[in-house]
Amino acid sequence: LQRRRQRQMCIRDRFTAILVTVINLCFCYPIAFYMAKVASPGTSRLLIISLIIPFWINELLRSFALRILFAGEGVINNVLLGTGLIDTGINFIAQDVALYTGLTYAYILLMIFPLYNAIESLDSNQLEAAKDLGSSTIRTHWRIVIPHAKAGIASGCTMVFMLTAGALATPVVLSSPNTYWFTQLIYQWFNMNDNWSRGSAYSILLLTISVTFVLLMMRIFKVKIGEIIR
């Protein structure tokens, strides 16, 4: 029974890591494109600085700040109650809204910058030509921008997935008391139960899953490992 629960925990956490990766990609792609091809150089530099500065603060402190925002009597609930949008407070912690938000925000730079570097190298004349030929915005992105940025997409997805799958501080702070993260289990085997063999086995399992995801990203986007780490 315990092993079955641990398998379910591992599968759930990997699904969460995939979902966070998809959310990060959908959120960061428009920002990266705007910075690379729409914004002026000055605006782009300002956005980059604005994105980097919050990450000067330790990840654990950022997680506690988000917990304060999403708490039952936190800022978000107070604003929603004050504006009359809700009648009773929402338990963002129990519903894992705070957890998904925290994990998405924690690794946002690892998605934005690979996308930004890839899109910036795209010749703007190709976008102008597509526009002159009557191509829609969605079609232009699907046929020109995304294929060109596939190495950046694969790189960003790989880093976000691996770090989300191995996260410990953010899940401990932002998850509900009933939610137990797979990395917490590994930490427990090493530091509380003093069972290094079991902890090592679980760590190897986590590493194997992460490497498998990297290989899957390489196959989906048809890129080589050198393009991902470039």
Annotated model-derived regions:
Residues 116-131, 200-230:
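C-terminal transmembrane helix and the adjacent membrane-cytosol boundary/short C-terminal tail
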Residues 56-63:
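Transmembrane alpha-helices and adjacent helix-loop boundaries
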Residues 15-27, 31, 57, 142, ...:
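Hydrophobic alpha-helical transmembrane segments of multipass integral membrane proteins
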Residues 63-104, 138, 174-178:
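Membrane-interfacial helix termini and adjacent extracytoplasmic/periplasmic loops
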Residues 1-11:
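Single conserved hydrophobic/aromatic residue that forms the stacking wall/gate
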Residues 8, 171-218:
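Interhelical loop and adjacent transmembrane-helix boundary motif
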Residues 19-52, 68, 126-127, 141, ...:
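Transmembrane-helix boundary motif in ABC transporter permease subunits
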Residues 53, 105, 111-119, 123-124, ...:
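Transmembrane alpha-helices
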